[in-house]
């Protein structure tokens, strides 16, 4: 039996497995793999992409490398964080204001990092938004035991680029876990209705899950009219202006805070169904993604408020955090 026949037998005639082994295990170049298999280099690229998408290959950020660069260490020590990951501009230098590109890069880094830090038995609270929705679709599957994923804010009607319940469900699926949904809107018409809904046993039980979160995963949210909370109907522009007038610079799961991280409370707070900032602060590991100049103040406020333990940022945000002066 010749070498080609042996390889075909070893990999059960699966060209994806064969290409993956040659490229990642034997260290062959894509051109060499193509020659060995008798296919084009483009075909090899497609095989390797299929392997990543199907979970045959796990590409992880080495947190010891990315977290040990001088800037990351300085930010970690300055804000008393557990871990800081800076996503380098690389070939995207000069494109920091491209929000779509930023979202793609942060979602990939966030998915890789979450994959590394998630542990068996974790209860993971996730916010919803476009970055997390994108991450849920692209993160690599990981086999975990007894992981529960719960959204930290009630739901709203789905948008073309954002399906709220699907995001938490997909993350749970990728982590071999189960999803716990709040089964309530993010905002209701009155404070009384909000209290009555939370008193319902089935809803109460899921809110209780929030108090048992061991990790939380969320993205920077500013207090500008571009915030998705307005687009999906949680707030209107007048209500957002009220928060700004009260000093709000950022928002996490519908809860606003000022430049020093102190909660900013308005009438609508009593109608929002989700985790509170006080509850969020109690979670052991709080993983925060931030990128883009319009999120600088919100990122700083979140750090000062104690809502973050693990920070993943772009280079621009890292430069801002290194240069900013802390309040005395």
Swiss-Prot record:
DNA-binding region: 72-91
Gene Ontology MF, one: DNA binding
A Gene Ontology biological process term: regulation of DNA-templated transcription initiation
This protein's record includes keyword DNA-binding: yes
Keywords: DNA-binding, Transcription, Transcription regulation
UniProt xrefs under InterPro entries: NagB/RpiA_transferase-like, RNA_pol_sigma_r3/r4-like, SorC_transcr_regulators, Sugar-bd_dom_put, WH-like_DNA-bd_sf
Keyword Nucleotide-binding tagged: no
Sequence similarity: Belongs to the SorC transcriptional regulatory family.
Name the UniProt record assigns to this protein: Uncharacterized transcriptional regulator YjhU
Source organism of this protein record: Escherichia coli (strain K12)
């Amino acid at each position: 039996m010749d070498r080609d026949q042996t390889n075909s037998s070893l990999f059960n005639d699966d060209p994806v497995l064969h290409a993956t082994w040659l490229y990642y295990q034997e260290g062959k170049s894509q051109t060499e793999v193509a020659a060995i298999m008798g296919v084009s280099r483009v075909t090899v690229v497609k095989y390797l992409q299929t392997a990543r998408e199907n979970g045959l290959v796990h590409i992880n950020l080495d947190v010891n490398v990315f977290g040990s660069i001088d800037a990351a260490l300085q930010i970690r020590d300055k804000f008393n964080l557990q871990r800081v990951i800076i996503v380098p501009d690389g070939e995207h230098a000069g494109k920091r204001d491209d929000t779509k590109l930023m979202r793609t890069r942060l979602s990939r880094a966030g998915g890789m990092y979450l994959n590394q830090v998630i542990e068996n038995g974790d209860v993971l609270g996730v916010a919803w938004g476009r970055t997390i929705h994108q991450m849920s679709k692209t993160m690599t599957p990981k086999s975990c035991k007894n992981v529960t994923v719960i959204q930290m804010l009630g739901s709203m009607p789905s948008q073309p680029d954002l399906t709220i319940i699907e995001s938490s469900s997909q993350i749970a699926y990728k982590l071999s876990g189960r999803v716990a949904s709040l089964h309530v809107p993010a905002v209701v018409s009155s404070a009384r209705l909000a209290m009555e809904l939370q008193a319902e046993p089935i809803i109460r039980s899921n809110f209780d899950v929030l108090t048992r979160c061991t990790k939380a995963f969320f993205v920077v949210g500013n207090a500008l009219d571009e915030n998705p909370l307005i687009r999906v109907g949680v707030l209107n522009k007048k209500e957002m202006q009220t928060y700004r007038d009260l000093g709000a610079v950022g928002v996490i799961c519908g809860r606003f805070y000022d430049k020093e991280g102190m909660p900013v409370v308005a009438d609508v707070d009593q109608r929002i169904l989700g985790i509170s900032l006080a509850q969020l602060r109690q979670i052991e590991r709080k993983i925060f993604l931030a990128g883009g100049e319009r999120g600088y103040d919100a990122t700083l406020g979140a750090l000062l408020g104690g809502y973050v333990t693990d920070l993943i940022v772009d280079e621009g945000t890292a430069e801002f955090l290194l240069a900013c002066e802390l309040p005395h």
